[in-house]
Amino acid sequence: MRVLLAPMEGVLDALVRELLTEVNDYDLCITEFVRVVDQLLPVKVFHRICPELLHASRTPSGTPVRIQLLGQHPQWLAENAARATALGSYGVDLNCGCPSKVVNGSGGGATLLTDPELIYQGAKAMRAAVPSHLPVTVKVRLGWDSGDRKFEIADAVQQAGASELVVHGRTKAQGYRAEHIDWQAIGEIRQRLTIPVIANGEIWDWQSAQACMATSGCDAVMIGRGALNIPNLSRVVKYNEPRMPWPEVVTLLQKYTRLEKQGDTGLYHVARIKQWLGYLRKEYIEATELFQSIRALNRSSEIARVIQAIKI
């Protein structure tokens, strides 16, 4: 089976990708989205989102990385897809699933689910602009407020020439509510298409991954939030390994505080460490205690001192 690390805006940046791929066995990472509006973006934008471009589009541990684009104008999606791959990205992905109100308000992400023809035009333009040996992939949800158009959406992706499709098993309106996950609908899409379909949504451990694959028939999954709850989740999902022990999680956090974010003004780790602990608290009691000890701190250096001082 393949396990992919999902794009998560404001969460899974290059530093977190570096950490997680070092202790996992991911087959691929997708970047946070590059927002495309009405221009060919400068090279520095791609390097900021995906510094791995400077290293053959791989993390330090060797996991391939693919740039994701977010936008609605086929011409500019195509030109930026061509630039991304010219810079070395291992293919390019089109975001048709982000449920953020800010993103949707500008016509991107899940908004495209209301217009399968636009998904087709965007993906087709990207496919034409990217060398044929490199993948062009698309990530979608089941629909905007219902799954009634899920086949129309999936057909648009395949007919555009996409290499594979990632399907998050909920509509935009359903957000991330667990009770609405529909792996069976993903399976119906998989049966309809000839390109590979990757299942995404509510995969937290070995059991849920097995259930997802059994229900959907997919042999590949993409994991997002769960990868932060259990830092070695790909190995849990692939090999039924136990979750990472807390002392190893601490070691990972300690390394994180030592990594430097380009352009950081001393605040980067404040938000990111607290955010990550918010995920870890769902699996580790110790994470709650650590969060309480740093919640009032507002400088990266202060948080680093607390975490580095933990005895393991």
Swiss-Prot record:
<comment type="function">
    <text>Catalyzes the synthesis of 5,6-dihydrouridine (D), a modified base found in the D-loop of most tRNAs, via the reduction of the C5-C6 double bond in target uridines. Specifically modifies U16 in tRNAs.</text>
</comment>
<feature type="site" description="Interacts with tRNA; defines subfamily-specific binding signature">
    <location>
        <position position="274"/>
    </location>
</feature>
<protein>
    <recommendedName>
        <fullName>tRNA-dihydrouridine(16) synthase</fullName>
        <ecNumber>1.3.1.-</ecNumber>
    </recommendedName>
</protein>
<dbReference type="InterPro" id="IPR018517">
    <property type="entry name" value="tRNA_hU_synthase_CS"/>
</dbReference>
<feature type="site" description="Interacts with tRNA">
    <location>
        <position position="95"/>
    </location>
</feature>
<keyword id="KW-0285">Flavoprotein</keyword>
<comment type="similarity">
    <text>Belongs to the Dus family. DusC subfamily.</text>
</comment>
<feature type="site" description="Interacts with tRNA; defines subfamily-specific binding signature">
    <location>
        <position position="295"/>
    </location>
</feature>
<dbReference type="GO" id="GO:0050660">
    <property type="term" value="F:flavin adenine dinucleotide binding"/>
</dbReference>
<feature type="active site" description="Proton donor">
    <location>
        <position position="98"/>
    </location>
</feature>
<dbReference type="InterPro" id="IPR035587">
    <property type="entry name" value="DUS-like_FMN-bd"/>
</dbReference>
<feature type="binding site">
    <location>
        <position position="68"/>
    </location>
    <ligand>
        <name>FMN</name>
    </ligand>
</feature>
<feature type="binding site">
    <location>
        <begin position="7"/>
        <end position="9"/>
    </location>
    <ligand>
        <name>FMN</name>
    </ligand>
</feature>
<dbReference type="GO" id="GO:0010181">
    <property type="term" value="F:FMN binding"/>
</dbReference>
<keyword id="KW-0820">tRNA-binding</keyword>
<feature type="site" description="Interacts with tRNA; defines subfamily-specific binding signature">
    <location>
        <position position="272"/>
    </location>
</feature>
<feature type="site" description="Interacts with tRNA; defines subfamily-specific binding signature">
    <location>
        <position position="35"/>
    </location>
</feature>
<keyword id="KW-0288">FMN</keyword>
<dbReference type="GO" id="GO:0102262">
    <property type="term" value="F:tRNA-dihydrouridine16 synthase activity"/>
</dbReference>
<dbReference type="GO" id="GO:0000049">
    <property type="term" value="F:tRNA binding"/>
</dbReference>
<dbReference type="InterPro" id="IPR042270">
    <property type="entry name" value="DusC_C"/>
</dbReference>
<dbReference type="Pfam" id="PF01207">
    <property type="entry name" value="Dus"/>
</dbReference>
<keyword id="KW-0521">NADP</keyword>
<keyword id="KW-0819">tRNA processing</keyword>
<feature type="binding site">
    <location>
        <begin position="224"/>
        <end position="225"/>
    </location>
    <ligand>
        <name>FMN</name>
    </ligand>
</feature>
<feature type="binding site">
    <location>
        <begin position="200"/>
        <end position="202"/>
    </location>
    <ligand>
        <name>FMN</name>
    </ligand>
</feature>
<keyword id="KW-0560">Oxidoreductase</keyword>
<feature type="site" description="Interacts with tRNA">
    <location>
        <position position="176"/>
    </location>
</feature>
<dbReference type="InterPro" id="IPR001269">
    <property type="entry name" value="DUS_fam"/>
</dbReference>
<dbReference type="InterPro" id="IPR032886">
    <property type="entry name" value="DusC"/>
</dbReference>
<keyword id="KW-0694">RNA-binding</keyword>
<feature type="binding site">
    <location>
        <position position="139"/>
    </location>
    <ligand>
        <name>FMN</name>
    </ligand>
</feature>
<dbReference type="InterPro" id="IPR013785">
    <property type="entry name" value="Aldolase_TIM"/>
</dbReference>
<feature type="site" description="Interacts with tRNA">
    <location>
        <position position="279"/>
    </location>
</feature>
